[in-house]
Amino acid sequence: MEISMDLIKKLREMTGAGILDCKKALEEAGGDMEKAVEILRKKGAATAEKKAGRTTKEGIIVAYVHFNGRIGVLLEMNCETDFVARTDEFKELAYNLAKQVAAMKPLYVRREDVPAEVIEKEKEIYRAQIKDKPENIVEKIVEGKLEKYFEQVCLYEQTYIFDDTKKVKDLINELIAKTGENIRVSRFTRYEIGEGYED
């Protein structure tokens, strides 16, 4: 099947992937745009895994303060070179992720950051909620509830507030694939007026 340049351009605009990668994805998908996007997203995840071990010493710290002045976020996002750290795309993603933290209140960056004792406590709570269920399905239900917990409390597992078809980790992986560098959110702090105070 011959893939038109218009189709390649359209896919490139949607994903930010290289022309050759777009052409290959479209050929593999038989010209189906949605399948091609999925192929590129999977490739981005594979690229991200390869680059995950590389050192990220450059980056930026962004600050976001909600318009009412009651919520603020500081977020550190790192990459390998200052060249990537200075790009508009990198800065925009970091700023949008700070907005994500302000809106969605994650507690951790990645699921690996959740302490084992917190996970065990959550599992105990879930088991207590479904203690009358047969034992063979209890573990499946507990694992399902734990996944939902991660989607709430881990930034990377959250649905992106500006595009509910993607998770935050998908956006990071797409930028890794596009820049060829390891990129990660290192940490964030969220502030809210009155939070943590009791009378």
From Swiss-Prot:
GO terms under cellular component: cytoplasm
**Segment Involved in Mg(2+) ion dislocation from EF-Tu: which positions?**
81-84
Tell me where it resides.
Cytoplasm
> Has UniProt tagged this entry with the keyword Magnesium?
no
Role, per record:
Associates with the EF-Tu.GDP complex and induces the exchange of GDP to GTP. It remains bound to the aminoacyl-tRNA.EF-Tu.GTP complex up to the GTP hydrolysis stage on the ribosome.
| Assigned protein family | Belongs to the EF-Ts family.
Listed name of the protein: Elongation factor Ts
Gene that codes for this?
A: tsf
